[in-house]
Amino acid sequence: LKPVSAEDGSRLWLRQSTDAHAQITAPRQSPTLNIAVNELKQAWKGLPVTLVLKKDKQLSSEGFRIRQVNEKLTVTSPTETGLLYAAYHLIRLQEMRNFGKPSETDLEITENPAYDLRILNHWDNLDRSIERGYAGKSLWNWEELPGTLSDRYEAYARANASIGINATVLNNVNASSKILSAEYLEKVKALADVFRPYGIKVYLSINFASPMQLGGLSTADPLDKDVIAWWKQKVKEIYRTIPDFGGFLVKANSEGQPGPCDFNRTHAEGANMLADALKPYKGIVMWRAFVYSPTDADRAKQAYLEFQPLDGQFRDNVIVQIKNGPVDFQPREPYSPLFGAMPRTPQMVEFQITQEYLGFSNHLAYLAPMWEEFFDFVKPSSLKAIAGVANIGTDTNWCGHPFAQANWYAFGRMAWNPSLTSETIAEEWLKQTFFDASNPKHAPIAYEIHNMMMESREAVVDYMMPLGLHHLFAWGHHY
């Protein structure tokens, strides 16, 4: 009898065998390099691999070059994180049956990420509920942190590193000021320590009224000297606890959240105050452009009317984070008119990986075609960074629907390289997750499922947005 066990999806797309015993050489030992070496030793079945730390004018800090000469592979990057990304890329190519065997000709692959910042936004609350989450509770067990570290924290970091995601915002944009308390900063530090070897920086969503709610001040006016001093001291405290902290994500004057407009100040004045506090530590502010403008009832125009006149007024370490469409993550929207309308202001796109308007975790909706459609109109090079609202929770398979994992995977791959096609990404995910690329019996099934994935988003558009009408769902929960 042959033992049979069910596949629970917990290994995501990282289902390769772990008994390869590959020959790997590294320049030194470190937490990050040790991970890269161990991943390759366990999974790589190809030629001997030498990892080399070396500056290269053609490589960005996280870029890498894989070169095959005769029967040896050399992997080069300026940084340890770049070598880790290269290790995962080698394993991906192996699973796709594309690389790593002896060849009569020399081969070379060069990869540079399109964006320095490739970040997940978790809309996770401190009570472990998730706004627009459909895969269980929040991964972050705040009550047990910092003393108890779940194995899933490292598994989460590993999954993100394998697809090139290098940053995470841990908490909801509708933020509790409690996240900035000394008690919670120690909890955040514990997570940052787990993520760091995988090249992942931690960021926090903040409540703009934190000086009042947490600091006992009478105002949160960004031009008030006591408010400025409070934020500078708080930022100093954060970096003393987490030296490589990334910065803040801010939802201000939107859906009831406090912001600078409450004090007759502009979004730029609010963002710049925070940016000035973060700048000595090389931190950044991601300031969301999702606002309900008081000056015009047409929602599709509101972000444009509010932000376009502020072009050129933001500090250089502020990035305006704009939803891909002008309304709110609908199954199909035109791109936001803010893209390209603020040439003197760094911008980043916010995609929604979680399926708030596309059937929760009940529906198969492969979202890479939607994001590919966006990049057909908005030049990737016009953006400074890319964010995705996460679809991850405590469900055994991480994302609820078995195919929702593909959207997490696709976001990471497209954040690294926006020129990848949704077809290619779907094929990668399927071969790593469900099918053995070397087994010809799998090919017909894989072909049919690939087609199903590629047609799924358009099907959602057809039955959720007939005649181009949007917001057709029940009140509140958006289903």
Regions found by a protein language model. Give the residues of each.
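Substrate-binding groove of N-acetylhexosamine-processing glycoside hydrolases
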Residues: R240, P258, R265-Y479
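Structural motif
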Residues: T25-S30, L53-K57, T76-P78, D124, ...
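Active-site-proximal beta-alpha loop/turn segments in soluble metabolic enzymes
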Residues: S176-S177, M212-P222, K251-D262, F290, ...
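Feature activates predominantly on carbohydrate-active enzymes
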Residues: A36-E39, S60-G63, Q68-K236, R240-L249, ...
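Active-site beta-loop-alpha junctions enriched in small/polar residues
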Residues: L120, N125-D127, V173-A175, N207-P211, ...
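Acidic, contiguous N-terminal accessory segments
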Residues: L1-N70, P78-T81, T105
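Second-shell loop/turn segments in exported
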Residues: Q23-T32, T74-S77, W142-P146, P260-F263, ...
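Glycine- and acidic
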Residues: A20-P27, A135-E143, N171-S177, G216-A220, ...
